[in-house]
Amino acid sequence: MLPGRLCWVPLLLALGVGSGSGGGGDSRQRRLLAAKVNKHKPWIETSYHGVITENNDTVILDPPLVALDKDAPVPFAGEICAFKIHGQELPFEAVVLNKTSGEGRLRAKSPIDCELQKEYTFIIQAYDCGAGPHETAWKKSHKAVVHIQVKDVNEFAPTFKEPAYKAVVTEGKIYDSILQVEAIDEDCSPQYSQICNYEIVTTDVPFAIDRNGNIRNTEKLSYDKQHQYEILVTAYDCGQKPAAQDTLVQVDVKPVCKPGWQDWTKRIEYQPGSGSMPLFPSIHLETCDGAVSSLQIVTELQTNYIGKGCDRETYSEKSLQKLCGASSGIIDLLPSPSAATNWTAGLLVDSSEMIFKFDGRQGAKVPDGIVPKNLTDQFTITMWMKHGPSPGVRAEKETILCNSDKTEMNRHHYALYVHNCRLVFLLRKDFDQADTFRPAEFHWKLDQICDKEWHYYVINVEFPVVTLYMDGATYEPYLVTNDWPIHPSHIAMQLTVGACWQGGEVTKPQFAQFFHGSLASLTIRPGKMESQKVISCLQACKEGLDINSLESLGQGIKYHFNPSQSILVMEGDDIGNINRALQKVSYINSRQFPTAGVRRLKVSSKVQCFGEDVCISIPEVDAYVMVLQAIEPRITLRGTDHFWRPAAQFESARGVTLFPDIKIVSTFAKTEAPGDVKTTDPKSEVLEEMLHNLDFCDILVIGGDLDPRQECLELNHSELHQRHLDATNSTAGYSIYGVGSMSRYEQVLHHIRYRNWRPASLEARRFRIKCSELNGRYTSNEFNLEVSILHEDQVSDKEHVNHLIVQPPFLQSVHHPESRSSIQHSSVVPSIATVVIIISVCMLVFVVAMGVYRVRIAHQHFIQETEAAKESEMDWDDSALTITVNPMEKHEGPGHGEDETEGEEEEEAEEEMSSSSGSDDSEEEEEEEGMGRGRHGQNGARQAQLEWDDSTLPY
């Protein structure tokens, strides 16, 4: 029956709507009718739970959004027209998918961001369509609660709170946690917003990290091994998304506070010529808050392996003795092997330092006459010695110097030897000198004798007192034994070095008591003792420790140097003052060419504390000074290397000066970069001049020794004395020695003369000079000189040619008045020969004059005949023409002929006459006459333009 009744509803509604009268009554009728039709409200669930994925618009509801209406299937009244959401600015909307079924959908108006809001709660209601299409009286359902959760998407990577982390750890400790790093994630869900893991990206580091970001060390850290570690750490969220950027963790290793010196460098480079250079400009002492009351610092420069104990001048012993002002008469018992000093030829030698090494199997005999038999009651023995513990039998004597019987007997007259690390000097007087029990053996017991280091020994004898100086310090003998004098005999004595000669009491004379060690500069000076000043100079080191600005050391600082300045002791009670004092300690090497290499450096410290049972210990500073290689000088000798002199000049009292213009120049190569920075050309070397000393120059005779019966080299002793140089002269040449400047040696060489009072059989003599610095360490080039002797029949020709020889441009012409006068004097001939020459010359003058007259007439005719032809030709303008004539070639041309030769002969005759009569014409006029006579006519005019201007040329 209900469906039958419902079919009338539209009709009734139409009738009701269609009636136009009634006004309010009609409206009320419609409501009554609608109430009869739309009896029920829509129905929905009381609550909904929805999920929406962020960045999406679909909401999945549980249960689904469906509204029911009991008025169904009545049109409009039983249909669902809308779902309404109650709330402010909610990003959701509900739409009806099917009015009849009441199915709806909840969706987002715009993308949902979980990071802004994770969940939403709001009210929703369903509305039916009312009673008709134009009805607004819709019925609504009850309010249902909708709760929506936003589902997160892992769109953000973890980020660390700090871009970098820094921590400081103490070496030698294991930490549970050095520091903690922390990362965050901006995702909203626990799954994606939480950090699940941390990881160290840097490999091979002694660190680990846990899931909470705590970093710990896996092993004990050492400050000496590595001062600082830098590691990279990353983080992962629970979705395993890594951090966008790793963070840097810097771990500084702090050393355990150890007392010691800080801020010093192990290698210190020293450039030669740098003067006094600070060794530790920034050093300071760390005491770790120790209660220090006083401090003693010992700085030691170890140079035992440089030369003979330190960097000393390497000049020869003679040069050093001269340089230090030692008395003359010193005899070198270990000279460099040479023809004159051949007794050291068989010894082992280090040529660079002239150090002789004795291996216990060799000795050297000093020839008779080198050392006088009677040394007198005053004499001095000096030597450098390096000696270690005696090998083999300890009782064996090791002889340094020995004077014993050559044959028959085995008496030792005087000797110097080492026995059981004791230095012993034996001196036995003869009966003719003393006849009483006198001191004979002097013993010194010193640790340095067997320490395998170089030491300088001086034994001063003023009998019966004998004093030993070692490294400048004085030592008296700890034991002196007496003995009777030696009985007189006629047995010759043998002086030996490195062993003692055993001439008697054996089947065959031989060496005995061999020395094991090294010796250098072994000398003896009979008749005089050396002063303390000379001894100090001879053993002085040229390198050592120094203090810059002594006045600024500060109060309370005491310091002390040893004699060689290799050890410096400083004491003080204020650490700040001690620091400043040690910062001023420097190294100095005064040699221009020091020995390159390493010098060990040690700084030891002794600390006293305030009443503490245990005081801090400060480790030694172990460093070294590297002395760099000095610039190598190049010594060059230059000057005139060939000249002629007349024989008469060689016979004169002054002789011939050999090296009037010699120059000694020392240069070094300096590398310069090209001026253009962009160029790729190699660097060029530029020679720069430098000044330094020389220690000898040898003038050697080449081609046979000098014959002392007719020739010699001479040099005034005053020239040497005023320049503090010495010289030795022999038939092989002249040797100048002594430490002096290059200019001093130049001045001395300028005065070397050669004389030959029988030059008739000699054509030329050749000489060679070679100079040295530092005992041959640097040598010059070999400068060769040839001196030719002009005999009387060669003087005229040689004079004419000699003045045309042009010296090299870097040489200065040196004119010697004595040379010119000698040449003129040599031209004088005996009176009878002069008369004959005058007569001959007169005849030649007449013949030459006639010949010249005829030649001039012939030339004049020739000029007149050819003048017309020349006018038609192009004139040759030779006003600016310069013709250079080789002065070593012949001057005769095709147009000169015999007339010119005759003119020259006439000229020479006139010169001889002028010389014999004492005429003193100038050199310039003579040269012009010699070049210009005999040229006439056109050739004469042309010769005026081609004249050789030799007014400035030396003879």
Swiss-Prot record:
Compositionally biased intervals (Acidic residues): 899-913, 920-929
Signal sequence annotation: 1-20
UniProt topology in membrane: Single-pass type I membrane protein
Residues that span the membrane, as ranges: 832-852
Substitution effect: residue 765 to Q: In a colorectal cancer sample; somatic mutation
Entry-linked InterPro entries: Cadherin-like_dom, Cadherin-like_sf, CLSTN_C, ConA-like_dom_sf
Subcellular compartments: Postsynaptic cell membrane; Endoplasmic reticulum membrane; Golgi apparatus membrane; Cell projection, Dendrite
Region listing for Disordered, in residue ranges: 887-955
UniProt key word DNA damage: no
Glycosylated residue positions: 56, 98, 342, 374, 716, 729
Pfam families: Cadherin, CLSTN_C
Annotated tissue distribution: Restricted to the brain.
Cadherin domain boundaries: 44-160, 161-280
Coiled coil: none
Primary location: membrane
GO process annotations (BP): associative learning; homophilic cell adhesion via plasma membrane adhesion molecules; inhibitory synapse assembly; positive regulation of synapse assembly; positive regulation of synaptic transmission
One function term, GO molecular function aspect: calcium ion binding
Keywords: Calcium, Cell adhesion, Cell membrane, Cell projection, Endoplasmic reticulum, Glycoprotein, Golgi apparatus, Membrane, Postsynaptic cell membrane, Repeat, Signal, Synapse, Transmembrane, Transmembrane helix
Protein name as annotated: Calsyntenin-2
